[in-house]
Amino acid sequence: MRCLIVHNPRSGFGSDAVFAFERELVHAGDECVLRVLGEDCDNEQILADAESFDVVVVSGGDGTVSNLLYTLRNRNVDTCVFPSGTANLLFANIGNSPEPAALARACRWANTVSCDLGEASWELDGRRHTRGFSIMAGTGFDAELMAAAA
């Protein structure tokens, strides 16, 4: 299996569990490509060749995961959510094991679920803006809190 892992090291508490997950795949004979997200990364560029992999693993907190999944929308790409954030709400709702070896097995066996994404659009200063989300979207004070936490 060819696996692309896109990881945000700034998510959560900086856990290195994603590397244990990667080792499990490599020891089983799979090929893994790891791309680490920096501050000014372009998700479209990071995921430009996503279709050339058997699975794309998105590793980070809920914000990172939502942004990467939204970037992959409307593309025929199998994805795996790896919980590297603080709350990992989407991951918790999917129901996978958080243990790296178990998650690697599920990934290799192509155990999948379908998940809907939402999209919010608005106009500001004559420009249309669109954002995707996987769990929830907030406005006003909630949005200000989330922006401050990022």
Where would I find each of the regions flagged by the language model?
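ATP/NTP phosphate-donor binding region
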Residues: 1-59, 66, 70-74, 101-105
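Catalytic core of DAGKc-family lipid kinases
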Residues: 6, 10, 15, 19, ...
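Short, contiguous clusters of charged residues that form electrostatic/catalytic patches at enzyme active sites
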Residues: 41, 63-66, 113-118
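Glycine-rich Rossmann-fold phosphate-binding loop(s) that bind the pyrophosphate
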Residues: 60-61, 84
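Short N-terminal helix-initiation segments at or just after the protein's N-terminus
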Residues: 61-64, 79
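Short active-site-adjacent helix-start/loop capping segments
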Residues: 65-68, 88-90
